[in-house]
Amino acid sequence: MEVRHDWTVAEVQALFEKPFMDLVFEAQQVHRQYHEPNKVQVSTLLSIKTGACPEDCKYCPQSAHYRTDVERERLLEVEKVLDAAQKAKVSGATRFCMGAAWKNPKERDMPYLMDMIRGVKDIGLETCMTLGMITGGQADELAGAGLDYYNHNLDTSPEYYGQVITTRTYQDRLDTLSHVRDAGMKICSGGIIGMGESSRDRAGLLVELATLPTHPESVPINMLVKVKGTPMEDVEDVDPFDFIRIIAVARIIMPMSSVRLSAGREDMNEQMQTLCFMAGANSVFYGCKLLTTPNPGEDKDMQLFAKLGINSQEQAAKPDEVQEHELLGQVAQRVAARPGKDDLFYDATV
């Protein structure tokens, strides 16, 4: 199957309407053409700055607009981030993702963020960040520090977007993706299913991703995790078969991308997750929490992988204990030498 960038909503809707077994079979055929069928890429996601976000995303418990149980926290110290990255490495992750609840990073944060990137790279993991909107200059800085992936989801279709968020435009999101690509980084971008959107909106989201000049290297598909206190806490559950169809269609129209089974896995049984892998999902987040939402523990994932004969992708070479100690010491020295350290922490709602 050739890689296309001219998919239409009508074509994608037609895929959704295929008999379920036919759709999954086609997706598995495409998957086997471009990927090893029994390999899954494993990432770990850490919240490096939690809560008090000025955006009004109706699904998000970190928004300052809603009363949830999420406690606001300042930007994590570099040492704590690297400690979490080391643990992720030991647990089997190959990529370490760092997320901050910001509208956009401020310039005073950039030195800290770049130290995090360099430190995680030194540990031997791929790096990914999601920091909100970024400028072209910030994208260049992050790329210069060695950031491999930048995540910025489109969330939903352009038509339904206004029902989800009003503090950031759809074009803002597309502009950020353009800055990321221009800086030479890989793109991680997907959406959330189950926010009350129509099947046409789901098709529209995938078309937006599949008609980018270059398909995202990673496409996370999230199932809404309903959180008390957010406007979407009572939205109707998405049908599991509809969710699996999303995975299958994403695999068919973006054949070379990694399709990540992302948030919501805690509410999926093993059978549903297995059908998602059959439909072309070949990446997961590993660990008991995704930012502030629950996720299956490592043991559960390893048990499921063993049942299915799935192997996680090979890690890069891991530094030995002495090397790790030296690397942490070097990063600590860089941080301690920076003037105005305390000024790098701030309230994101200001």
UniProtKB/Swiss-Prot annotation:
Alphabetized UniProt keyword annotations: 2Fe-2S, 4Fe-4S, Biotin biosynthesis, Iron, Iron-sulfur, Metal-binding, S-adenosyl-L-methionine, Transferase
Cofactors that this protein relies on: [4Fe-4S] cluster; [2Fe-2S] cluster
GO molecular function: 2 iron, 2 sulfur cluster binding; 4 iron, 4 sulfur cluster binding; biotin synthase activity; iron ion binding
Cofactor note: Binds 1 [4Fe-4S] cluster. The cluster is coordinated with 3 cysteines and an exchangeable S-adenosyl-L-methionine. Binds 1 [2Fe-2S] cluster. The cluster is coordinated with 3 cysteines and 1 arginine.
Chain ranges of the Radical SAM core domain: 38-257
InterPro entries (UniProt xref): Aldolase_TIM (IPR013785), BATS_dom (IPR010722), Biotin_synth/BioAB (IPR002684), Biotin_synthase (IPR024177), Elp3/MiaA/NifB-like_rSAM (IPR006638), rSAM (IPR007197)
HAMAP family linked to this entry: BioB
Purpose of the protein: Catalyzes the conversion of dethiobiotin (DTB) to biotin by the insertion of a sulfur atom into dethiobiotin via a radical-based mechanism.
Family classification: Belongs to the radical SAM superfamily. Biotin synthase family.
The name this protein goes by in its record: Biotin synthase
Organism: Photobacterium profundum (strain SS9)
Lineage of producing organism: Bacteria, Pseudomonadati, Pseudomonadota, Gammaproteobacteria, Vibrionales
